[in-house]
Amino acid sequence: MFHATTILAYKGKNKSVIGGDGQVSFGNTVLKGNAVKIRKIKDGKVLAGFAGSTADAFNLFDMFEENLEHAKGDLLKAVIEFSKAWRKDKYLRKLEAMMLVLNREKIFLLSGTGDVVEPEDGKIAAIGSGGNFALSAARALDKFADIDEEKLVKESLTIAGEICIYTNTNIKTYVIEDEK
């Protein structure tokens, strides 16, 4: 069984940020400590990250990028079409991966069953083995600290990496800033 990662997405006042740790584990063994499981897509206007089976996630990334192209960059339309395709395809329903996607307007969690979930607060979502730790830390920092969006994501993932054995503190982030 692969236990692979923690991904955190945060849509702040001036920036959207996605971050992930670098650990990939198989059973009780760390296979890799510097994997990159986040991407910039659609000319850097959309951020995406995955947790779960790596091969499955790459297939999902490719499919999602195609949907985003067909939707001309409209993230909401792309996630809805992606979800429809996922639920109709017997092969896709067996994929063991989840994705987070966001731009400056929206943030979505795409589940392994084809569900599309927009976080209740509309700004913070996390997936993966350390996702609940990162989500808790991000909510607390968002509520009580006045820090930069990217720093919030890095600190939250670091906290998750200190608690979850399937998450490390080799953090990578991507940022989309408001156009000036």
UniProtKB/Swiss-Prot annotation:
Coiled coil: none annotated. InterPro entries: ATP-dep_Prtase_HsIV_su (IPR022281), Ntn_hydrolases_N (IPR029055), Proteasome_sua/b (IPR001353), Proteasome_suB-type (IPR023333). Pfam families: Proteasome. GO terms for molecular function: metal ion binding; threonine-type endopeptidase activity. This is ATP-dependent protease subunit HslV. It comes from Campylobacter curvus (strain 525.92). It is an enzyme of class 3 (hydrolase). Allosterically activated by HslU binding. HAMAP family: HslV (MF_00248). Belongs to the peptidase T1B family. HslV subfamily. Its EC number is 3.4.25.2. It is found in: Cytoplasm. A double ring-shaped homohexamer of HslV is capped on each side by a ring-shaped HslU homohexamer. The assembly of the HslU/HslV complex is dependent on binding of ATP. The active site is at residue 5. The keyword Disulfide bond does not apply. SUPFAM superfamilies: N-terminal nucleophile aminohydrolases (Ntn hydrolases). Protease subunit of a proteasome-like degradation complex believed to be a general protein degrading machinery. Na(+) binds at residues 161, 164, 167. Its main location: cytoplasm. The lineage of its organism: Bacteria, Pseudomonadati, Campylobacterota, Epsilonproteobacteria, Campylobacterales. One of its GO terms (biological process) is proteolysis involved in protein catabolic process. It catalyses: ATP-dependent cleavage of peptide bonds with broad specificity. Keywords: Allosteric enzyme, Cytoplasm, Hydrolase, Metal-binding, Protease, Sodium, Threonine protease. Disulfide bonds: none annotated. One of its GO terms (cellular component) is proteasome core complex. PROSITE patterns: PROTEASOME_BETA_2.
